[in-house]
Amino acid sequence: VPLQPYLRVLRLPGVPASILLMFVARLPMTAMGITLTLHVVSELGRGYGAAGLIGTATTIGSALGAPLIGRLIDRHGLRPAVALCGLASCAYWLSTPHLPYEALLVVALPAGMLTVPAGSLARQVLTALVPPPQRRTAYSMDMMSLETSFMIGPALGILVSTQLSSTVALTSIGIAFGAVAAVLYAANPPVRTAAESAAPRTARQPIRTWLTAPLVAALFIAVGATFVLMGTEIAALAALRASGEVEWTGVVIAVMAVASAVGGLVHGAVPRSLSQLPLMVLLSVLVLPVGLVDQPWWLLALALVPMNLACAPTLAATTEAVSALAPPGVRGEAMGLQDSATRIGLALGAPVVGFVMDHSAPGWGFAAAGAGGLLFAAVGLALQRRRVREPVPAATG
């Protein structure tokens, strides 16, 4: 794989520091779910279902809050949003070890709304720092950074929770959120290009002028992508449990993450690549037959490699589509909607695929994940064709 495109992006001013900062910012986000689950189960004596309710409330809060935080960034810049979210996240996670379950359930949704938006911030900063011809490479690099954080963050959360205590782990997450917010506030990376910043500020555009059919299609496909990914993980875990090989779950997930990172590396390095919709279809189709070879564990891991090679490219292409379709003045809100779409997909994937497996077998979970992805892709295609037949009014301003 030629690495020159990545080297050229890394030579751009501000890019290496921003990628490193956003990688660190994502670590507490990737660790918080599993750490809070362990705390609810081990320290509060509740079941996994009770822990899942808190996770669901947090996810709903994040989905509701992401576009609102994005709008705040569009109107007032990065610092007010980072200060608000940083203080709220730090306070919530520092207090979490000392709250009863009922209180955690009540505050989970508002806390989710005010989570530091590391993902959308990373995409906005890269869009501001990187010229359009190089953005696919930059977004692919961001996806590889995300994969790495998902390999490290949960492992750190589990390690600290089991070797020390969940109280120490949750407190560490709170401190990390506060430190990340402080560094982001001090660094104040740009969220608009130099030309966009120099242009005179205009009134906020009504959402109907920029939330066009192609952008809605891109968001639907984003929901489908994370639906497939979450459904596949749940199906893989169920298959390993059914074959008595659940101890190999970590290895299988690691193989999936590495395959995704390799796919992202290739996607960002080649001169031309597939767009979001074909990648989404490829992601969905490749997971359909996995259930035919879901044991032993090493064969399952190998069967999941082709599908995961399309994972990071699909997510990177989603960011590329959203950044291209959203006007600069509402880019933060659009990136927030992208965050909401991905969280909705994650929230839908587990229960839908789980329901299918409860009434059949683990192998059908992979088929359900792929079929669901194709359904969302079909909706995206229909919206794109509607845009061709009936032009949506262009954004003004």
Language-model features: where?
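C-terminal transmembrane helical hairpin of 12-TM major facilitator-type secondary transporters
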Residues: Q276-A316
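Conserved MFS/SLC helix-loop-helix module at the cytosolic interface between two early adjacent transmembrane helices
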Residues: A63-P100
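Helix-to-loop junctions at the C-terminal end of transmembrane segments
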Residues: L64-G77, S161, V262-S275, M357
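Cytoplasmic helix-loop-helix junction between adjacent transmembrane helices
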Residues: L109-T148
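Helix-loop boundary and gating motifs at the non-cytosolic
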Residues: P2-I60, T209-A254
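Helix-loop junctions at membrane interfaces in 12-TM secondary transporters
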Residues: T96-A108, L292-A303
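Intracellular juxtamembrane helix-capping segments at the cytosolic ends
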Residues: P117-V130, A236, P313-A326
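Structural signature of the two symmetry-related core transmembrane helices
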Residues: P80-L94, T171-I175, Q276-P289, A367
